[in-house]
């Protein structure tokens, strides 16, 4: 194992990627290659994220990937020099057990201190920790490292369900319904990419999984990504009617103002949207539907009573004080929706707050 001084020197070199008047770029790159600080035909850049976690950057991983994730990729590629380098820098060698595909690499990991095999719950923990990094690079890597990984074939689906629900919320049942583990995981990474509008990752999955277009639309509706939804709609990749789209926009999470408004512009039934929001206890969505002209208050109250949602019954009982928001009388262009609704607060929720202070805390 190299000395601490050698390890430190390599870290310093990896951190110092600046133009230097006293040394040519070619010679500097030659030094980096000789020190093993080279990946994907380019220098390895070492940096730290906001949580002070070490990150590795290359032209392929421009946003940076966590050190342990970089180790898993190096193991998958059977890149022995980088396996040793990342371990020297503090990567957990046991992460490498996720992506081993040759006995020679397994032997190297053993020599570097890896255990013989991972427990099922350890594989789940590794996935969970890897998901801390929400970037296009990381979602693509998650797909490459985990989706068709034999270690995931016998994973505890109860534990896997918790991870999926952490990111997918009420889409979890739809995702887990009658799908193979590889399809579940592919849709999972794809769904995260859409949820956080990771454009490079969205394009990566779109090019490879054209049969998952409906899933992409479902995620865009559910997670308020109106820009991606509009992109799919204008290219005729949406095969749902307007009310089906509105149902997803209102049911999965609260404050889905952009996708609700988009479906409203397409002609979806705004009263039905309010009923869906009531059924799912999405209070912001209820008030936004009222802003857009929903007025079926008696039916909404009956549904809320049936569900036992007393607070919503109280909200809908004050229908006399509500009125449509005139700001929406002039239609907003789809490309402007996200910007205009970014910090939006429903007018009728503001009225309700003034009338019944303290009853509901949004």
UniProtKB/Swiss-Prot annotation:
InterPro entries: ASFV_MGF360 (IPR002595). Keywords: ANK repeat. The keyword Repeat does not apply. ANK repeats lie at residues 66-98. It holds the Pfam family ASFV_360. GO terms for biological process: taxis. Belongs to the asfivirus MGF 360 family. Plays a role in virus cell tropism, and may be required for efficient virus replication in macrophages. This is Protein MGF 360-19R.
């Amino acid at each position: 194992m190299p000395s601490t001084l050698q390890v430190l020197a390599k870290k310093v070199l990896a951190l110092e990627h600046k133009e230097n008047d006293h040394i040519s770029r070619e010679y500097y790159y030659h030094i980096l290659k000789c020190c093993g600080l080279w990946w994907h035909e380019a220098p390895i850049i070492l940096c730290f994220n906001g949580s002070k976690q070490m990150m590795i950057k290359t032209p392929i991983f421009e946003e940076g990937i966590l050190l342990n994730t970089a180790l898993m990729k190096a193991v998958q590629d059977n890149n022995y020099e980088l396996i040793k380098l990342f371990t020297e820098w503090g990567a957990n060698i046991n992460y490498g057990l996720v992506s081993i595909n040759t006995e020679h690499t397994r032997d190297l990991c053993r020599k570097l201190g890896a255990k013989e095999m991972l427990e099922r719950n350890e594989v789940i923990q590794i996935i969970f920790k890897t998901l801390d990094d929400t970037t296009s690079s990381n979602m693509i890597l998650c797909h490459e490292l985990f989706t068709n990984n034999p270690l995931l074939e016998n994973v505890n689906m109860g534990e896997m369900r918790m991870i999926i629900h952490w990111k997918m919320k009420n889409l979890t049942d739809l995702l887990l319904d009658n799908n193979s583990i590889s399809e579940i995981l592919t849709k999972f990474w794809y769904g995260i990419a859409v949820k956080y509008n990771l454009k490079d990752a969205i394009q990566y999955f779109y090019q490879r999984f054209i049969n998952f277009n409906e899933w992409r639309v479902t995620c865009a509706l559910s997670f308020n990504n109106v820009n991606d939804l509009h992109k799919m709609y204008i290219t005729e990749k949406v095969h749902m009617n307007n009310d089906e789209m509105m149902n997803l926009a209102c049911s999965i999470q609260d404050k889905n103002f952009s996708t609700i408004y988009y479906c409203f512009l397409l002609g979806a039934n705004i009263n039905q949207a309010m009923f869906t929001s009531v059924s799912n206890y999405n209070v912001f969505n209820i008030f936004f539907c009222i802003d857009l002209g929903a007025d079926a208050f008696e039916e909404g109250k009956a549904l809320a009573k049936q569900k036992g949602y007393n607070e919503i019954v109280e909200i809908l009982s004050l229908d006399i004080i509500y009125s449509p928001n005139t700001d929406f009388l002039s239609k907003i262009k789809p490309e402007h929706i996200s910007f205009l609704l970014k910090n939006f607060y429903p007018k009728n929720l503001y009225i309700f707050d003034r009338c019944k202070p303290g009853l509901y805390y949004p």
